[in-house]
């Protein structure tokens, strides 16, 4: 959904089945086979109740991830999906719910569903049941039909987010001509409008054909939604999503929109982030039933249950709106240009990537944002509002939300919101002038505070660790390029001792995620580079230790692009002539000469890499021999 994501995080599952017993979860293999065969027989039966019962059992099996391979292998999707077109409303609803739940498991599951031709009945559902449908207040199945539509829209979203083939089929269908009619809040519920907006938000991004269709079919409806009055979470969510769809219809390049529309959109995003997420979650936790000790929580009943459900829905909508707002902001200030659709490996693209990543001399990343956008970011205090989302509610509040079944989704949303906020901060750091971030001291504080999240909050949370270390790296980059050889700003790090970086070094040693290792290696390298401007016995010792550590890690590294990052980091640190003595002390050129053929061999073995990693490996491979020759010559003259 956003350009800040390297991989798609797992979506939260919504349970269709009311109960999932331990007995079912531990079904023996032969019993499971029998159960699947029974489901297949029921789904292909003629009786409505029989088909409905089969779909309910299907939904219960989906709740246990261990059952998914057998569900896929036995072709349950191929049999269940056509029931989206069943004459019985209850059967369509059960089929939509089960398939939607299955699509949330993993991207690979969506691929398997596509292989079993799930898109044909999904497309037919929209063509046959959604083209002219409006909720009938007098219909007994009104709520059921509305829920079926929402589930089918969510299913479509999940498939398109995971599969390019699904996006292709979507473009060949009439679905994008049908969905805009569901943006009318006068006819359809806010739940339906929200589901459609969420789907469009995803399928329109980087999809020129979809952009054109939605622009011509839904422009007026989307602008109407921008002008909605009120601060209710459901209203803020609709307005935020509408803003995101409008931006995506112009290829992500918000500056092509009229100035008044840009102002309205930026104000909506800022207002959405002005709601205190920690406060509303704390208020909710006061109404959530607590565990009675053995782990059992007695759910409220009657009116109390309705009030709690309403509050949970409201908080969920608010967190969803804030996450969407953050993703939109991250994309606005992303280095990727809206018209850079071709993905050609041209030198100009590589130069742009280098500029965005490193803020090279010449045009700064912050100069690439148009003045009117920069003014909006600063006047609306966007950075502070996004940063606030990196802070979770109090620990006791999080525990209460996690323990109660009804609020577990909110607990997961809070963790996701924190991660997305950090990824957005990463983009904002390269976009905003350092003066508007509190100067060097302000950026240093961001580095310190983010370090607490990365190393102290939850070391097992890989998504948090990756996003937090990316922010720490970006913060040091900001300080480094602001410094430009001026040692004054580096006094912040002049007292840095080995004990201060032990957490980072340990983190690199123990880390199993290449992206996090890369961030940490680059980060300790930037620290060493900052210390080069303030050399003394203590800082020299720290630089040598960091150097030897990176060299040691480079020999152990399996991923060629992380190895290239480590080598590139050392080249950066020792490119200054003041480091010649230190380079001689750690025998840098001899050790890099040993790494050079290793890097070349790995580069030959691991050719299938994302574009930015290919650039990194290519740069390191070509620069290393020249650097070794240059540095060896310098050292020989000492």
Per-region residue spans from a language model:
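HEAT-repeat alpha-solenoid elements in large eukaryotic scaffold proteins
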Residues: 2-20, 46-62, 92-103, 146-159, ...
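Acidic, serine/threonine- and proline-enriched intrinsically disordered linkers and terminal tails
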Residues: 2-31, 132, 266-416
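Alpha-helical scaffold repeats of the Armadillo/HEAT/TPR superfamily
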Residues: 6, 32-35, 72-79, 113-124, ...
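Long alpha-helical repeat scaffolds
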Residues: 6-9, 38-41, 56-60, 79, ...
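Alpha-solenoid helical repeat scaffolds
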Residues: 22-61, 65-69, 75, 123-128, ...
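Elongated alpha-helical scaffolds that mediate protein-protein interactions in large eukaryotic proteins
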Residues: 24-34, 42-44, 50-53, 60-78, ...
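Alpha-solenoid helical repeat architecture
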Residues: 43-46, 84-87, 102, 126, ...
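Alpha-helix N-cap/helix-start positions at coil->helix boundaries
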Residues: 48-49, 65, 89-90, 107, ...
């Amino acid at each position: 959904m956003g350009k800040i994501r390297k991989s798609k995080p797992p979506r939260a599952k919504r349970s269709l089945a009311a109960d999932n017993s331990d007995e079912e979860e531990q079904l023996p293999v032969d019993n499971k086979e029998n159960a699947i065969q029974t489901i297949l027989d029921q789904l292909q039966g003629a009786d409505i109740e029989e088909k409905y019962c089969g779909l309910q059992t299907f939904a219960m099996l989906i709740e246990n991830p261990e059952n998914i391979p057998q569900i896929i292998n036995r072709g349950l999707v191929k049999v269940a999906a056509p029931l989206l077109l069943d004459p019985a409303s209850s059967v369509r609803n059960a089929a939509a719910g089960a398939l939607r739940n299955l699509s949330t498991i993993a991207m690979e599951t969506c691929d398997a569903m596509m292989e079993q031709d799930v898109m044909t009945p999904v497309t037919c559902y929209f063509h046959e049941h959604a083209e002219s449908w409006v909720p009938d207040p007098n219909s007994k199945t009104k709520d059921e039909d509305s829920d079926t539509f929402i589930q089918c829209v969510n299913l479509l979203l999940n498939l398109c987010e995971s599969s390019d083939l699904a996006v292709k089929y979507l473009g060949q269908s009439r679905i994008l001509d049908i969905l805009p009619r569901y943006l009318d809040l006068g006819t359809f519920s806010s739940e339906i409008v929200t589901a459609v907006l969420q789907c469009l938000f995803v399928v329109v991004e980087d999809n020129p054909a979809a952009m054109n269709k939605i622009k011509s079919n839904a422009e007026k409806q989307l602008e109407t939604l921008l002008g909605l009055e009120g601060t209710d979470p459901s209203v803020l969510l609709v307005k935020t999503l509408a803003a995101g769809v409008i931006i995506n219809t112009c290829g992500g390049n918000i500056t092509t929109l009229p100035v008044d529309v840009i102002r309205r959109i930026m104000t909506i995003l800022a207002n959405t982030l002005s709601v205190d997420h920690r406060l509303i979650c704390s208020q909710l936790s006061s109404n959530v039933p607590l565990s009675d000790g053995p782990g059992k929580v007695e759910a409220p009943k009657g009116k109390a249950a309705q009030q709690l459900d309403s509050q949970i829905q409201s908080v969920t909508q608010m967190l969803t709106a804030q996450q969407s707002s953050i993703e939109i902001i991250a994309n606005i200030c992303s280095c990727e240009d809206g018209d850079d659709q071709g993905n050609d490996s041209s030198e100009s693209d590589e130069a742009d990537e280098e500029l965005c990543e490193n803020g090279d001399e010449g045009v700064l990343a912050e100069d690439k944002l148009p003045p009117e956008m920069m003014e909006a970011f600063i006047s609306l205090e966007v950075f502070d509002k996004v940063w606030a989302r990196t802070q979770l509610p109090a620990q006791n509040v999080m525990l209460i939300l996690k323990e109660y079944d009804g609020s577990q989704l909110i607990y997961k949303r809070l963790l996701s919101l924190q991660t997305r906020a950090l990824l957005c901060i990463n983009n904002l750091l390269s976009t905003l002038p350092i003066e508007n971030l509190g100067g060097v001291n302000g950026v240093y504080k961001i580095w310190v505070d983010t370090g607490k999240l990365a190393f102290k909050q939850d070391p097992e949370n890989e998504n948090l660790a990756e996003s937090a270390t990316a922010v720490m790296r970006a913060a040091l980059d900001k300080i480094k390029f602001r410094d430009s050889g001026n040692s004054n700003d580096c006094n912040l790090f002049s007292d840095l001792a080995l004990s201060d970086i032990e957490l980072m070094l340990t983190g690199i040693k123990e880390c199993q995620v290449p992206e996090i290792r890369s961030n940490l290696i680059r980060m300790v390298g930037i620290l060493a580079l900052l210390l080069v401007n303030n050399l003394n016995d203590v800082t020299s010792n720290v630089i040598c230790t960091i150097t030897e550590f990176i060299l040691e890690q480079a020999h152990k590294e399996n991923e060629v692009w992380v190895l290239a990052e480590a080598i590139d980091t050392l080249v950066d640190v020792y490119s200054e002539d003041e480091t010649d003595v230190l380079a001689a002390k750690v025998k840098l050129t001899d050790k890099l000469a040993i790494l050079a053929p290793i890097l070349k061999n790995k580069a030959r073995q691991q050719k299938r890499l994302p574009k930015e990693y290919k650039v990194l490996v290519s740069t390191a491979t070509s620069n290393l021999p020249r650097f070794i020759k240059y540095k060896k010559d310098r050292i020989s003259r000492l």
